[in-house]
């Protein structure tokens, strides 16, 4: 067997600046993460416990979906109807579906909808908050603790940029949540028209969520997600001083993150990785992989390819038979591997065939010696 090493030059390495300092951001904490692999690209104060305002409603909806169905009906309590700040003006005794409450909580960031949802799913706000904290612990959100389902400022209500990003990625796995947070507007019962607070949905191409938040203590905060050319990036910014500043900084963070990756064919099924000698005068045997591997890789990282293949083969060989392997590494980490297989079958000659070949070789050698 032989081992061949090579360096794969990732496309556009020279065209994109190396991962130097990211954009200048105003705020208390931020984090930029690959939404597919979870790789953190950039962060600052990512573990600091901070108020997160209405980003809380991602957990509210996530927990509610474990206890009620979208078509269930909730009767609005006086407490829910009277809560202040952002609301859809629910009325005490009003009957409204869980689906409508979720849309109002995620799009309009309605506090009354979040409270009604918590009461409908948990029986009481206090019990529902317990469920929220249990869920946070189960998800490994170690920097997080909830005191209410709406996100209004309260002692003991906090999270971190790291946890918020993780929560958003988990919540987006729920189709109903992913569909709702991508909407700029919606209509629900009671002739209510909902409008999103997420300005990036209309200003930054590829944005598909997820949740904003604003209170006096939390400042202007948001976890946003955008996709371009097959790359998904999440960016969380907590404690920005103004809505415009938050939007501008998140735009920079998302754009920065999206330029860090390219989709690269690490292992190609069209490429001949090795050619092995075949005995008895047979044509050399090309070795390929049965399937290719395409991955998103950082544009500033070089990859090492290792090809393990035989110099020659023994017959018979069948098409598809594994004879070697291709591996691609980033540093010491194995990113991909595929078997090297024969591209055609080669039968072993019979006794007379082998004898004839040996005789021909002997005659050729003798003639070469004479001449």
Which sequence ranges carry the predicted segments?
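Active-site-adjacent loops and short helices of periplasmic peptidoglycan-processing enzymes
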Residues: 20-175
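Generic detector of short alpha-helix boundary/capping microenvironments
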Residues: 8-10, 25-26, 48-49, 81, ...
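Intrinsically disordered, low-complexity
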Residues: 6, 20, 366-367
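Domain-terminus/edge residues, biased toward the C-terminal soluble/receptor-binding domains
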Residues: 153-158, 162-371
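Positively charged n-region of N-terminal signal peptides that target proteins for export
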Residues: 1-5
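Bacterial N-terminal signal peptides
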Residues: 6-17
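Sterically constrained small-residue positions within well-ordered secondary structures
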Residues: 11, 21-23, 226, 316-317
